Regions:
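A compositional/structural signature for long, glycine/proline-rich flexible linkers
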Residues: 1-206
């Protein structure tokens, strides 16, 4: 009798856990349920309106997990990549180079995240309660490189480039990248294939 009474609760807890697990990282199931992995420019996934009222519960959960500000279009476009130009995962024992062109936008930047969707920290300077400034050090801002629309840029990604402007550090962790384009030209919404995503070129590996 006790088991019968508890069965609905056990089933509910089990289903809750199983429905949450796919959203602990960028997975095929999460991409399918949210639609966030179905639209791509090269290997960069995009979704043009994270802040739409029409989002389903899976999309809202995924946006919260990724820590992206759910700004409505046409304020921001987010693109994410987890593989290089060869289709290989972005791993912590290799160095990479981003080669791209400045987008038509008010502001743009790259952020690097671990596969747990958290900012990566310097293992030699870990902080239990990192400040915004600590985490923002792991962002490569467009204004550090060039503000000229259409100009080419290069960003190095390696184990520890924390003190180098216009670079990103993975500290030996597997990772994914987020390209954030704020105040984008509306032409990108009409034709997303025109979004100038960067090439992700693998360099030396240990």
């Amino acid at each position: 009798k006790l088991l019968k009474k508890l069965a609905p609760y056990l089933v509910g807890v089990t289903l809750g856990i199983l429905s949450f697990i796919p959203f602990t990282r960028q997975t095929t199931i999460a991409s399918f349920l949210t639609g966030f992995g179905s639209n791509t420019v090269n290997q960069w996934n995009y979704f043009l309106d994270y802040g739409s009222e029409s989002q389903n519960m899976w999309q809202r959960a995924y946006v919260s997990l990724l820590g992206l500000l759910p700004s409505a279009s046409p304020e921001v476009i987010y693109l994410s990549a987890s593989v290089d130009d060869n289709g290989d995962g972005l791993v912590g024992n290799c160095e990479y180079t981003l080669n791209g062109v400045v987008p038509k936008a008010r502001y743009w930047s790259y952020a690097i995240y671990g596969n747990d969707n958290y900012y990566l920290q310097d293992p030699n300077n870990l902080k239990d309660d990192p400040t915004y400034e600590d985490l923002f050090a792991q962002v490569a801002n467009g204004h550090e490189l060039t503000t000229d629309i259409g100009e080419k840029y290069e960003i190095k990604i390696g184990n520890n480039f924390i003190n180098q402007e216009g670079s990103l550090s993975h500290f030996g962790n597997d990772f994914n990248l987020i390209l954030r384009i704020y105040g984008p030209d509306l032409i990108y919404y009409d034709d997303p294939s025109l979004i100038p995503v960067a090439k992700i070129l693998k360099g030396s590996c240990k």
